[in-house]
C-alpha cells in the first residue's frame, strides 16, 4: 500500500476561535493525479479557496509524507491515525463533569415527561396510538409529523425502571403505533412498513422523502422493532403474526440472487432509484424472523441475502445509506452491516460472516473523524470558554458522507451508536483502534450535552443545544449508551459479566437492546435494574450499572472507571429506593475484582472505592 498524508495542521480547523469554520476547504484529496493515473494525491491550496489567489513570483509550501508498507490499506490508515495524527493522545486530554450513567437517569426523567419529550396520543382508525413530535422535514407534512425511534430502548427502560408512566401509559400506545404502521391491505405492499412517520393532520403514515416503500424499511420498522418488543413480551401472539407478514413480504421481494430493490413507487409499484443498488443489510430482517419464529426458511433466505451482500458490498467496499433526504449516500448503515453479519455468524458459526463483519467494521473506521489533532487551546463557544479537545470532532462518526451528506455542513454526530459494536470488535480482534474509537466517541462529551435533560445534540455544530427538533433521539441515546457500557463491562470482566443483546435498532447504527432476560454476574443470575436515587456517586469518571437477584437478596453495583488514571469515589446507597413500599437493610458488602475474586468491605450505607484506569469493580450487596 502507498499513501500520501498531509502534515497535521494543513487541513481546516473546524472551530479555530469563536465560530464554525467547518466548511473551509484547505486540502483536497484524490486517488488520481493530474495525468489521470491511479495515485494518491494531495492538493493544497484548493483552487478558488483560501490562499489560492497568488501573484507571479509568490510561493507557498506545505509538508506531506509518503507511506509505503507491505500491508493492506487498513494497516496504513491505522499508522496515519495513530502515529501521524496521534489519535491515542486524545483520551489523555479528556475530562468530564457528567457521567454517561447520570445522563441515562436524566433522560429517563426527560422521556417520561410528556411536555419535554413532546409525546402525544392520538386516535387513528379507532385505535389510540402514541409517538413523539418530529419537527424536521418530512414529505407532505404540515409540521404534523410524529415518530418513535428506538423501540428496544423503550421496552428496555420500562423493564429496568418498572416505571408505570412507561409500562402503563407509553408502551401500549407505542405498540399500537407499531401495529398500525404496517401496510395491512392484501396487495404488493402487504406486511411492509407504511412509513416512518405519522402525519396527524392528514391521518396517514408516510416516508421521509417521498411516496415510495423500501424493503429495508420493513427490516427496520417492522422486523427490528417488533423483534425487540417480542424479546420482552414473547407472549404477544398477534405481534408474531405481524412479524410473519413482514418477513414473508421480504421473501416475496427478494430476487433469486439474494438481492433487493432499493425501493418501489407506492402508486405504480415499479422499482425506483434503479440507478443504485441495495447495498444495505436488508437481509437482517429475515435473521430476526428466524430467531423469533424459528422457521428455517427465513434463515436460509437471510444467508442467501448475506452472501450477495458480502460479495457485492463488503468485498468491494461499496455501501448505500438509509437516509432518503440525501439520496442514500453512505451512512451509519455500514456500521449496522458489521453487527448484522456478526449476528449471522453467531447463529451459523460460518467464519466467512465473522470475517466480513470485521472487514466492514474496519471500513467504518474511515467514517470516524481523526483530524485535526485535539489540543488544550482555549476557544469561545457561545460566550463560554472551551478547550479545543472539548469540542473536537475527533472520534465522532458522520451521519452521512458524500457530496450531499450532512458531514459537509454540519460535521459529525454525537449519536455514537457504533461504540458498543466497536468494543465487541476489539474483543474479537484485539485491534486497539476499535476500542480507542469507541471511548473517544463516548467519553468526555460534556460540551455537547444539555445538562437540564441529559440529551446530547445530534449534530456537532449544534454544540449543547440539546434535542432541538428531534426529541425521539433521546431514546437512541439511552440505547447506545447502555450498549456501550454493557459492552465495556463484558470486556473488562473478561466475560465474567454478560448480558444477552437483543436486535439492532433501526436506522442510526448498530447498538443493541438489553434487559429482556437475566444476565450473569460472575456466576450469579441477575436482572438489570435502574432505580433513581438508589446509588449516589461523587466522581463522574465512574460509570455504573445495577443488577438484582431478588431470590438471593443480592444487588450488584457494577462500577467502571472511564478514565486513563486511577479514580476514587464515595458511594452512598439509599435502600428505600430499591423496592417501592418495601424496606430492606444491608447485611454485608463484598468487593469483586475483574476476575470475580471477593473481599469483604466495611460499612452498610456508604463505601469508598478505588478503581484502576479503565478498570472494573463490583460491589456485591446482600440485604434482608
Where are the regions a protein language model picked out?
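Extended amphipathic alpha-helical coiled-coil/heptad-repeat regions
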Residues: 177-304, 310, 314-321, 330-333, ...
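Well-ordered alpha-helical scaffold segments within catalytic/enzyme domains
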Residues: 149-164, 220-238, 280-295, 336-350, ...
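CBM-like carbohydrate-recognition segments
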Residues: 366-414, 423, 427, 433-498
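Carbohydrate-recognition beta-sandwich/jelly-roll modules
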Residues: 1-241, 245-248, 553-555, 567-624
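Solvent-exposed loop and edge beta-strand segments that line ligand/cofactor-binding
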Residues: 47-49, 130-148, 201-223, 262-281, ...
Amino acid at each position: 500500500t502507498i499513501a500520501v498524508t498531509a502534515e497535521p495542521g494543513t487541513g481546516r480547523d473546524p472551530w479555530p476561535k469563536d465560530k464554525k469554520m467547518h466548511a473551509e476547504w484547505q486540502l483536497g484529496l484524490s486517488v488520481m493525479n493530474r495525468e489521470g493515473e491511479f495515485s494518491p494525491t494531495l492538493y493544497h491550496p484548493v483552487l478558488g479557496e483560501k490562499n489560492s489567489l497568488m501573484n507571479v513570483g509568490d510561493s507557498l509550501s506545505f509538508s506531506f509524507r509518503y507511506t509505503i508498507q507491505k500491508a493492506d490499506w487498513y494497516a496504513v490508515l491505522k499508522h496515519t491515525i495513530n502515529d501521524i495524527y496521534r489519535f491515542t493522545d486524545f483520551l489523555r486530554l479528556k475530562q468530564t463533569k457528567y457521567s454517561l450513567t447520570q445522563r441515562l437517569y436524566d433522560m429517563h426523567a426527560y422521556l417520561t415527561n410528556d411536555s419535554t419529550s413532546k409525546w402525544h396520543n392520538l386516535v387513528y382508525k379507532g385505535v389510540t396510538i402514541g409517538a413523539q413530535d418530529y419537527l424536521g422535514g418530512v414529505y407532505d407534512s404540515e409540521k404534523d409529523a410524529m415518530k418513535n425511534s428506538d423501540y428496544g430502548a423503550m421496552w428496555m427502560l420500562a423493564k429496568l425502571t418498572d416505571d408505570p408512566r412507561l409500562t402503563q401509559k407509553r408502551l401500549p400506545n407505542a405498540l399500537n403505533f407499531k401495529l398500525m404502521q404496517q401496510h395491512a391491505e392484501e396487495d404488493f405492499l402487504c406486511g411492509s412498513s407504511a412509513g416512518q412517520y405519522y402525519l396527524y393532520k392528514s391521518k396517514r403514515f408516510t416516508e421521509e422523502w417521498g411516496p415510495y416503500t423500501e424493503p429495508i424499511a420493513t427490516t427496520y420498522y417492522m422486523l427490528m422493532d417488533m423483534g425487540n418488543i417480542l424479546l420482552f413480551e414473547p407472549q404477544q401472539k398477534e405481534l408474531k403474526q405481524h412479524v410473519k407478514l413482514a418477513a414473508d413480504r421480504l421473501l416475496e421481494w427478494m430476487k433469486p440472487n439474494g438481492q433487493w430493490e432499493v425501493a418501489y413507487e407506492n402508486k405504480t409499484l415499479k422499482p425506483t432509484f434503479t440507478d443504485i443498488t441495495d447495498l444495505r443489510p436488508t437481509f437482517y430482517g429475515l435473521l430476526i424472523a428466524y430467531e423469533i419464529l424459528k422457521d428455517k426458511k427465513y434463515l436460509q433466505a437471510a444467508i442467501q441475502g448475506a452472501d450477495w451482500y458480502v460479495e457485492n458490498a463488503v468485498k468491494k467496499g461499496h455501501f448505500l445509506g438509509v437516509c432518503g433526504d440525501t439520496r442514500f449516500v453512505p451512512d451509519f448503515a455500514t456500521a449496522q452491516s458489521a453487527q448484522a453479519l456478526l449476528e449471522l455468524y453467531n447463529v451459523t458459526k460460518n467464519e466467512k460472516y465473522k470475517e466480513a463483519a470485521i472487514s466492514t467494521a474496519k471500513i467504518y473506521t474511515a467514517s470516524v473523524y481523526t483530524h485535526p489533532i485535539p489540543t488544550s487551546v482555549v476557544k469561545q463557544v457561545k460566550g463560554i470558554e472551551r478547550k479545543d479537545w472539548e469540542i473536537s470532532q475527533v472520534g465522532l462518526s458522520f451521519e452521512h458522507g458524500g457530496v450531499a451528506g450532512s458531514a459537509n455542513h454540519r460535521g459529525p454526530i454525537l449519536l455514537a451508536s457504533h461504540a458498543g459494536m466497536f468494543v465487541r470488535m476489539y474483543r474479537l480482534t484485539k485491534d486497539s483502534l476499535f476500542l480507542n474509537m469507541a471511548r473517544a466517541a463516548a467519553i468526555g462529551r460534556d460540551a455537547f450535552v444539555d445538562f437540564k435533560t441529559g440529551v446530547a445534540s445530534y449534530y456537532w455544530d449544534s454544540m449543547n443545544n440539546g434535542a432541538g427538533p428531534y426529541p425521539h433521539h433521546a431514546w437512541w441515546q439511552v440505547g447506545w449508551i447502555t450498549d456501550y457500557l454493557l459492552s465495556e463491562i463484558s470486556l473488562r470482566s473478561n466475560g465474567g459479566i454478560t448480558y444477552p443483546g437483543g436486535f439492532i435498532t433501526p436506522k442510526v447504527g448498530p447498538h443493541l437492546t438489553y434487559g429482556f432476560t437475566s444476565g450473569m454476574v460472575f456466576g450469579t443470575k441477575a436482572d438489570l435494574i435502574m432505580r433513581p436515587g438508589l446509588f449516589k456517586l461523587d466522581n463522574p469518571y465512574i460509570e455504573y450499572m445495577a443488577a438484582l437477584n431478588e431470590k438471593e437478596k443480592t444487588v450488584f453495583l457494577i462500577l467502571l472507571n472511564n478514565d486513563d488514571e486511577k479514580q476514587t469515589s464515595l458511594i452512598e446507597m439509599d435502600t428505600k429506593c430499591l423496592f417501592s413500599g418495601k424496606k430492606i437493610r444491608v447485611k454485608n458488602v463484598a468487593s469483586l475484582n475483574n476476575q470475580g475474586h471477593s473481599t469483604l468491605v466495611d460499612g452498610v450505607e456508604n463505601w469508598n472505592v478505588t478503581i484502576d484506569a479503565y478498570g472494573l469493580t463490583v460491589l456485591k450487596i446482600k440485604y434482608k
